[in-house]
């Protein structure tokens, strides 16, 4: 439980916001110095996502996606824009969203909205998104705020839409990172929060070929 490791919720959010303001708006900055893993990450994400986009009666649409904790648009550029007609981005750091406009290049014209907002305060437009992608950002929300955000995301899905969480998972319990003011939860804790938000797990996969010294990374598809 985040309530056991976060002493002051207001400070938890403020400290994270301050931390990201000092991070350079680059791929390396977004990935905490692990920019070299970006291609491995995107390639696996594409395979994971495409199983839901294939032909079939319940296939997920490709009209519109939402990139949560989007930063400068690394995932929007490499994963979402090639697969979806329109993408919206949301991030708490305004400088990242400003940088995104040049980083995304010509294809960036298909980014419809740049929302500058913390996810704890963000509500996706109901019935708007085929895919809501939430990567390396759930650790910046308390358990309660994460459950509430996922409930709002559920409302934001179009028919056959999915939510994807891709994030670090701890071996056991909840670990606080005091540097960037985030938490890392184990899979059981994340599963519990997902269930409390009224979502079902459709698929789960561990990311392969990452450096040994970093946390295990899992993708979860939810509806």
UniProtKB/Swiss-Prot annotation:
Enzyme Commission designation: 2.1.1.244
Domain of life: Eukaryota
Modified residues (N-acetylthreonine): 2
Catalysis performed (reactions): N-terminal L-alanyl-L-prolyl-L-lysyl-[protein] + 3 S-adenosyl-L-methionine = N-terminal N,N,N-trimethyl-L-alanyl-L-prolyl-L-lysyl-[protein] + 3 S-adenosyl-L-homocysteine + 3 H(+); N-terminal L-seryl-L-prolyl-L-lysyl-[protein] + 3 S-adenosyl-L-methionine = N-terminal N,N,N-trimethyl-L-seryl-L-prolyl-L-lysyl-[protein] + 3 S-adenosyl-L-homocysteine + 3 H(+); N-terminal L-prolyl-L-prolyl-L-lysyl-[protein] + 2 S-adenosyl-L-methionine = N-terminal N,N-dimethyl-L-prolyl-L-prolyl-L-lysyl-[protein] + 2 S-adenosyl-L-homocysteine + 2 H(+)
Binding-site residues for S-adenosyl-L-methionine, renumbered to this chain: 69, 74, 91-93, 119-120, 135
Gene Ontology molecular function: any one: protein methyltransferase activity
Protein's cellular compartments: Nucleus
Keywords for this protein: Acetylation, Methyltransferase, Nucleus, S-adenosyl-L-methionine, Transferase
Acetylation among keywords: yes
GO biological process, one term: N-terminal peptidyl-serine dimethylation
Cellular component, GO annotation: cytosol; nucleoplasm; nucleus
Keyword Methyltransferase attached: yes
SUPFAM superfamilies: S-adenosyl-L-methionine-dependent methyltransferases (SSF53335)
Main location: nucleus
Residues with the N-acetylmethionine modification: 1
Membership in a protein family: Belongs to the methyltransferase superfamily. NTM1 family.
Function comment: Distributive alpha-N-methyltransferase that methylates the N-terminus of target proteins containing the N-terminal motif [Ala/Gly/Pro/Ser]-Pro-Lys when the initiator Met is cleaved. Specifically catalyzes mono-, di- or tri-methylation of the exposed alpha-amino group of the Ala, Gly or Ser residue in the [Ala/Gly/Ser]-Pro-Lys motif and mono- or di-methylation of Pro in the Pro-Pro-Lys motif. Some of the substrates may be primed by NTMT2-mediated monomethylation. Catalyzes the trimethylation of the N-terminal Gly in CENPA (after removal of Met-1).
Identification of the protein by name: N-terminal Xaa-Pro-Lys N-methyltransferase 1
Organism listed in the record: Ailuropoda melanoleuca (Giant panda)
Taxonomic lineage of the native organism: Eukaryota, Metazoa, Chordata, Craniata, Vertebrata
